[in-house]
């Protein structure tokens, strides 16, 4: 049975008039017009072919060695004295049983003037720069593609809207001027690094205008470095026992971090002080399932070791609330930040959904989630939910009308697309955060 591939992420423009959605290797654009009317505004697909790129690389190498090979061929003879001619090297290609190749699109960000959209593509480990034209039939136009040696994992855009900070899978951080011309071969040196995979990055400044880069990694570290003098480490924030998957920054130097621990950490990143921790383990317990059982080789005799991790933590822009979700669960947890005691966190609300949450994002004072709705019966729905703050009720509520109309817009936009309408077994892996957890084998 074929289904529409679940949405992997959402990004909304400042005024809410544009929404970008990631499905597999595509970015879909939608215009939102009140009341609750959606209009499809184009699609961009990453058609980069890894196998073809491998062929091109091999061809260049062969061409460079052709003259040398011709000379050597004259000297090669068989046992009968016949000349032996070298054969061209085989082009590497996936063989039988090779793992599938997934061309994820990640890390959607808009520049502050919203004239450009920045994203990352796994296909060629690149940073994508799009022009955004709201008057065009297809609002996105790919302008540049900066390729890296390792996969970009997280990005942050500087206030000048031209500098992008990229953290990669290898542990290095780079600074790219998106107005520059992309190099054919990546030669840039990193501006700072970790000895572990980077998971998040933020470029921020203090009240004196000094800039800092905050990075988190798989080795439970949070590092604060001066920018652009990144060789100067300002401080480390120690306290996590497991990997850090997500960080977010608030006013007055507040930093929130989460990951493989069963706690949310609140910090004053300027002083390095751990302000508080919020233990959410009892709150999430009713939502855990078989997907949270530890891998068999790390289980006990009773097979009851549970492992879970926060996939994303994000702050409301104007309200004192922060939301997060645990991977492979059907809820988001909203916390209230104390206005009297900096860093104090208290439970505000838990919102449940019919399917597992895949992604969490924020637009002003609205939270948005995408759901793993591949098991939806009948007409597929529940692709995403838009969650608004109701001042009268002093609580967050799902805007069902807006969400339902968005479902209809998604269905109409992908009709006849054999790439986005796929078999269930061909859906991209949607739960990757838990793989960051280290076990005994990583320390041996």
Curated annotation (Swiss-Prot):
| Residue positions, PTM Phosphoserine | 93
Cite the InterPro entries for this sequence: Trm82, WD40/YVTN_repeat-like_dom_sf, WD40_repeat_dom_sf, WD40_rpt
**Which terms are listed as keywords in the entry?**
Nucleus, Phosphoprotein, Repeat, tRNA processing, WD repeat
Q: Name one GO cellular component term.
A: nucleus
Q: Which residues form a coiled coil?
A: none
Which superkingdom is the protein from? Eukaryota
The answer, when asked if Nucleus is one of the entry's keywords, is: yes
PROSITE patterns to which the protein is assigned, alphabetical: WD_REPEATS_2, WD_REPEATS_REGION
Localization, UniProt: Nucleus
Keyword flag Phosphoprotein? yes
Which GO BP annotation is one of this protein's? tRNA (guanine-N7)-methylation
- What segment(s) does the record annotate as region Disordered? 55-92
WD repeat placement? 1-47, 48-99, 100-147, 148-192, 193-237, 238-279, 308-354
Which pathway is it part of? tRNA modification; N(7)-methylguanine-tRNA biosynthesis
Q: Where is the composition biased (Basic and acidic residues)?
A: 71-85
Q: What SUPFAM superfamilies is this protein classified in?
A: WD40 repeat-like
- Whom does it interact with, and what assembly results? Forms a heterodimer with the catalytic subunit TRM8.
Q: Which family, according to the similarity comment?
A: Belongs to the WD repeat TRM82 family.
Q: What does this protein do?
A: Required for the formation of N(7)-methylguanine at position 46 (m7G46) in tRNA, a modification required to maintain stability of tRNAs; its absence resulting in tRNA decay. In the complex, it is required to stabilize and induce conformational changes of the catalytic subunit.
Show the HAMAP family listed in the entry: TRM82 (MF_03056)
What name appears for this protein in its UniProt entry?
tRNA (guanine-N(7)-)-methyltransferase non-catalytic subunit TRM82
Biological source species: Saccharomyces cerevisiae (strain RM11-1a)
């Amino acid at each position: 049975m074929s289904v529409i591939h679940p949405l992997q992420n959402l990004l909304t423009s400042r005024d809410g008039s544009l929404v970008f959605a990631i499905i597999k290797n595509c970015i879909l654009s939608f215009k939102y017009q009140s009341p609750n009317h959606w209009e499809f505004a184009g699609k961009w697909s990453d058609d980069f072919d890894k196998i073809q790129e491998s062929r091109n690389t091999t061809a260049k190498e062969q061409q460079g060695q052709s003259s040398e090979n011709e000379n050597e061929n004259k000297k090669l003879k068989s046992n009968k004295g016949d000349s032996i001619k070298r054969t061209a090297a085989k082009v590497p290609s996936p063989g039988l049983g090779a793992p599938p190749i997934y061309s994820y699109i990640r890390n959607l960000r808009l520049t502050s003037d919203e004239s450009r959209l920045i994203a990352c593509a796994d296909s060629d480990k690149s940073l994508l720069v799009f022009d955004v034209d709201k008057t065009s039939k297809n609002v996105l136009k790919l302008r540049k593609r900066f390729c890296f040696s390792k996969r970009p994992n997280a990005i942050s855009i500087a206030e000048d809207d031209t500098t992008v900070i990229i953290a990669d899978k290898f542990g290095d951080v780079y600074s790219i001027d998106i107005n520059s011309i992309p190099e054919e071969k990546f030669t840039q040196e990193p501006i700072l690094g970790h000895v572990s995979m980077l998971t998040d990055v933020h470029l921020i400044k203090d009240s004196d205008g000094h800039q800092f880069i905050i990075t988190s990694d798989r080795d439970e570290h949070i590092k604060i470095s001066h920018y652009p003098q990144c060789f100067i480490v300002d401080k480390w924030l120690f306290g996590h026992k497991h990997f850090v998957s997500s960080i977010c920054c608030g006013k007055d130097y507040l930093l929130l971090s989460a990951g493989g621990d069963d706690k949310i950490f609140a910090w004053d990143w300027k002083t390095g002080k751990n302000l508080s921790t919020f233990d959410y383990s009892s709150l999430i317990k009713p939502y855990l399932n078989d997907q949270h059982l530890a891998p068999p080789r790390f289980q006990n005799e009773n097979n009851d070791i549970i492992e879970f991790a926060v996939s994303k933590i994000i702050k409301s822009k104007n309200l004192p609330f922060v939301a997060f979700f645990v991977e492979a669960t059907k809820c988001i947890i909203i916390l209230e930040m104390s206005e009297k005691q900096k860093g104090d966190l208290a439970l505000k609300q838990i919102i449940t959904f019919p399917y597992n949450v895949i992604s969490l994002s924020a637009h002003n004072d609205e939270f948005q989630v995408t759901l793993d709705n591949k098991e939806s019966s009948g007409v597929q729905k529940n692709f995403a939910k838009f969650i608004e703050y109701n001042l009268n009720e002093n609580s967050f509520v799902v805007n069902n009308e807006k969400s339902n109309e968005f479902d209809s817009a998604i269905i109409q936009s992908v009709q006849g697309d054999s790439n986005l309408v796929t078999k269930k077994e061909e859906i991209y892996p949607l739960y990757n955060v838990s793989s960051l957890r280290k076990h005994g084998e990583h320390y041996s």
